[in-house]
């Protein structure tokens, strides 16, 4: 087997218990491109295409939910041309791979504030979500325009509004608060593809 392919033999053994929820920080794409004398956008495209490989491998391993940190709230500070390309990537990815994801019974969801993206990108993502909503395999969740501090702030505001409006009592617990988050589940395994040891405002 070539090094470019994932060897899943170990994960198929009975002794391996797959984590239920895995989160991946997709970074290092720009550095990958620079090392090869390519524009940063080439690195981002390579990273997006890799989503397919990772999602199919996660499905084979028995992972229930895969959350990919694809676009953070801090990414808006990058150069305008790079941001423009990053905003187009979800559309390029789903137009290329949505049929295969459907065949593999993979369900697409997203975490974050989609409204800031161009309408065309929103439409493609929402189409993928709606097309796959009845699938029962791996949940592939894209964290886009996502930041954990922002997630908690929005959750607290929503909870406070409901208390003020008399929709609920002021009796918040950790378990209840998780329902106000984009990602309510506990993360069993987090991976940062560049190897750096920081979480960059992701799923705090």
What is each residue range found by the language model?
Residues 1-204:
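Flexible, compositionally biased loop and terminal segments
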